[in-house]
Regions:
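Walker A/P-loop
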Residues: 14
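Short, charged, surface-exposed secondary-structure boundary motifs
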Residues: 38-42, 122-132
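P-loop (Walker A) phosphate-binding loop of NTP-binding proteins
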Residues: 8
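ATP-dependent NMP and nucleoside kinases share a basic, alpha-helical "lid"
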Residues: 83-128
Length: 140
């Protein structure tokens, strides 16, 4: 069974993925960390001086639009590319943000379950970021 966990920034998606993975006995992966090495670090390291994947990942909040654009470019020819690659390594995918990718993955049947993590009673919603999963059209 493949599970997609989505929600706003800092609402606990990774924590849910970790605990669900422990409960079900399966692996979870953060799509941000997964894509950092594949699509983000090679472009942003020379610009911002990142020496490691961790350096780049830890600074992601300061460059959210760039991250979104780089991952979108990585998936442009195949909107299911990231999910196909991540799901080859784990059953729980945490953090999809692109509507085109979301729809393509649902159409392909990549996910059996989609969970929305909502901590809006204690955390702000994400309105000023490249989050377009809730929109009907691609804006990038």
């Amino acid at each position: 069974m493949n599970i997609l966990i989505i929600g706003h920034k800092d609402h606990g998606k990774d924590e849910v993925g970790l605990r669900l993975g422990q409960l079900l006995g399966c692996k979870y992966l953060s799509s941000s960390l997964f894509m950092c090495e594949r699509a983000v670090l090679p472009t942003l390291a020379p610009l911002y001086g990142y020496a490691t994947v961790k350096d780049c990942y830890d600074d992601r909040d300061n460059h959210r639009q760039e991250w979104f654009d780089l991952i979108y470019a990585y998936n442009r020819k195949s909107p299911t590319r990231t999910a196909d690659e991540l799901l080859a390594e784990a059953s729980i995918y945490v953090g999809m943000r692109n509507r085109i990718e979301f729809d393509a993955n649902l159409d392909k049947g990549n996910f059996d379950v989609v969970l929305w993590v909502d901590a809006s009673k204690r955390k702000p919603k994400e309105y000023t970021c490249p989050w377009n999963l809730l929109r009907k059209t691609q804006t990038t």
